[in-house]
Swiss-Prot record:
Predominant cellular place of this UniProt entry's protein: secreted
Family of the protein in this entry: Belongs to the conotoxin T superfamily.
Segment forming the signal sequence: none
Keywords assigned by UniProt, alphabetized: Amidation, Disulfide bond, Secreted, Toxin
GO-annotated cellular components: extracellular region
Any one GO molecular-function label of the UniProt entry: toxin activity
Protein modification: Contains 2 disulfide bonds that can be either 'C1-C3, C2-C4' or 'C1-C4, C2-C3', since these disulfide connectivities have been observed for conotoxins with cysteine framework V (for examples, see AC P0DQQ7 and AC P81755).
Tissue: Expressed by the venom duct.
DNA damage among keywords: no
The species this protein was found in: Conus textile (Cloth-of-gold cone)
Compartment list: Secreted
Domain-related comment: The cysteine framework is V (CC-CC).
Threonine amide PTM positions: 15
Name of the protein: Conotoxin tx5e
């Protein structure tokens, strides 16, 4: 989902 995609681009989004 968006969170996973964001995590790939920016780890900050993951946390």
């Amino acid at each position: 989902n968006i969170q996973i995609i964001c995590c790939k681009h920016t780890p900050k989004c993951c946390t």
